[in-house]
């Protein structure tokens, strides 16, 4: 980043994407301090991919799946869900429900759900048909409520026709 700024590339033409919010913030702070920049305005594209997609798609927190939404989904489907949330710092998903974990992991790996299921050595008592039905029901639930999860954000962003053009 230092070299690009020294070479005259405008800070807003630099896209710096990290896995964690902490790393993006640290990089922006260092560059801002070193070059006398405003981290928030001049280095607006120093962020996580999830944060960038969220911003570019004009999302709001209310449109994102939260714990209460997962809890409601679990109650509707008759599956216990005590924990289910995406980390705001790095977009990772954490759930005590193995079905949701498998559904999310397949999405992250961009694998077909049943192919991913078949590739695992399923030590836990996870039924293939139940997994498929829950994944379909989760899609329907999110669509009916107008909600997205972090994986949906990335997919929607990739499908978006217009993107910012960065020098680096």
Where do the PLM segments sit?
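P-loop NTPase Walker
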Residues: 1-62
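Conserved phosphoryl-transfer catalytic core
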Residues: 66-90
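Alpha-helix C-terminal capping segments
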Residues: 31, 74-77, 160-162
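Hydrophobic alpha-helix position signal
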Residues: 4, 74, 142-143
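Accessory N-terminal region flanking or inserted into the helicase ATPase core
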Residues: 13-15, 85-168
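SF2 helicase/translocase NTPase motor core
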Residues: 39-42, 48, 67-74, 136-139
């Amino acid at each position: 980043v230092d070299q690009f700024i020294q070479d005259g590339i405008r800070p807003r033409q630099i896209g710096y994407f990290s896995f964690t919010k902490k790393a993006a913030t640290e990089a922006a702070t260092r560059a801002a301090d070193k070059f006398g920049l405003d981290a928030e305005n001049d280095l607006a594209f120093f962020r996580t991919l999830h944060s960038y997609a969220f911003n570019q798609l004009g999302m709001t927190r209310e449109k994102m799946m939260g714990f209460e939404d997962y809890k409601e989904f679990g109650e509707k489907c008759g599956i216990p869900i005590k924990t289910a949330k995406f980390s705001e710092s790095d977009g990772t998903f954490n759930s005590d429900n193995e079905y949701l974990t498998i559904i999310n992991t397949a999405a992250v790996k961009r694998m077909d759900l049943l192919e991913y299921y078949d590739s695992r050595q399923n030590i836990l008592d996870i039924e293939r048909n139940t997994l498929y039905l829950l994944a379909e029901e989760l899609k329907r639930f999110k669509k009916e409520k107008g909600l997205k999860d972090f994986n949906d954000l990335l997919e929607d962003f990739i499908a978006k026709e217009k993107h910012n053009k960065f020098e680096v």
